[in-house]
Amino acid sequence: MVESINSLEELGTVAKTEAAAPVDVQKLDAQGRAYATGKRKDAVARVWVKPGTGKITVNDKEFEKYFARPVLQMILQQPIVASNRAGQFDIVATVAGGGLSGQAGAVRHGISKALTYYEPGLRTVLKKGGFLTRDSRVVERKKYGKAKARRSFQFSKR
């Protein structure tokens, strides 16, 4: 290919004739599932999405049992509701590290990415909602000479 190009004109014609890589392609495994990883704080979630009845399983438990607080359940369902796909996909997630809030955010991030891998047309909706963006906020480290990350020790004049 490269050896046959002798001038700039030929390079221009070759560039026009070459097809661009397809952007919207499903990424599925052998069982027809879309796989993605989501992260938030110290939590890492591995998420599989496949067509089904809307069952969501987190660490081999129903998500209502694993995330008992309604706020965490709502966080988990946000990408599904935003894309109008409630009850259409079965979701299996394994999550480790961090606390419950970070884990819920990690699963949400993983669900969003897996939905875009399964159905690439949802990317614009989920991107607009901010579900595909990794939340990079992590705990600030403690500094020496300080009680915590920013809090100073109590000051005494005398």
From Swiss-Prot:
Gene3D superfamilies: 3.30.230.10. It comes from Brucella melitensis biotype 2 (strain ATCC 23457). GO terms for cellular component: cytosolic small ribosomal subunit. This is Small ribosomal subunit protein uS9. It comes from the Bacteria. The gene is rpsI. InterPro entries: Ribosomal_Su5_D2-typ_SF, Ribosomal_uS9, Ribosomal_uS9_bac/plastid, Ribosomal_uS9_CS, Ribsml_uS5_D2-typ_fold_subgr. Belongs to the universal ribosomal protein uS9 family. GO terms for molecular function: RNA binding; structural constituent of ribosome. Keywords: Ribonucleoprotein, Ribosomal protein. GO terms for biological process: translation. HAMAP family: Ribosomal_uS9_B (MF_00532_B). It holds the Pfam family Ribosomal_S9. SUPFAM superfamilies: Ribosomal protein S5 domain 2-like.
